[in-house]
């Protein structure tokens, strides 16, 4: 099997960085439903190292984190050659037009405000992962 075929047949890997257990549980449920593999972190201090080592297909990054904020983590990810091109979604309780602009200027590919609908999260993940999800796992979510 070629490397390209191996890549498309593997489940996408998502790195989730969230310090609230209930939010982690919700995100892991959504990712499991989509058929994704995932790594959950509640401490942002090692996010850059984990991203470099595992090369996830997508990162879901809370903004209001202890130790390093999501914006600080994002700056580190964008400076690192091994992680600069990994799509990152800001997952935040901060809502508003000015916040959206701030996140996009910081390099986030998108953002979702808490509380969010699982369907909205799943559509966003599907869009950002393009063809890395198996069609059967996202058929209902991504169908237009």
PLM regions and their residue ranges:
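Charged docking surfaces used in two-component/phosphorelay signaling
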Residues: 25-33
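Active-site beta3 strand of CheY-like receiver
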Residues: 54-60, 65
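Conserved acidic carboxylate
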Residues: 18
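The feature encodes the CheY-like receiver
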Residues: 66, 84, 96
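Non-catalytic signal-transmission and effector/linker regions of two-component phosphorelay proteins
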Residues: 1-15, 119-144
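Short hydrophobic/Thr-rich beta-strand motif most characteristic of the beta2 strand and flanking loop
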Residues: 35-43, 50
């Amino acid at each position: 099997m070629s490397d390209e075929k191996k890549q498309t047949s593997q489940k996408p890997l998502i790195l989730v960085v969230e310090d609230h257990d209930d939010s982690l549980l919700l995100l892991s449920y959504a990712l499991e439903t989509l058929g994704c593999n995932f790594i959950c972190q509640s401490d942002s201090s090692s996010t850059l190292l984990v991203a470099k080592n595992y090369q996830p297909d997508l990162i879901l990054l809370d903004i209001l984190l202890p130790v390093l904020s999501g914006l600080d983590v994002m700056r580190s990810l964008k400076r690192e050659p091994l992680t600069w091109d990994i799509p990152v979604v800001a997952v935040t309780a901060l809502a508003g037009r000015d916040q959206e602009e701030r996140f996009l200027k910081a390099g986030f590919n998108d953002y979702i405000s808490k509380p969010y609908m699982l369907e909205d999260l799943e559509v966003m993940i599907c869009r950002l992962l393009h063809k890395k999800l198996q069609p059967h796992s996202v058929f209902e979510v991504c169908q237009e």
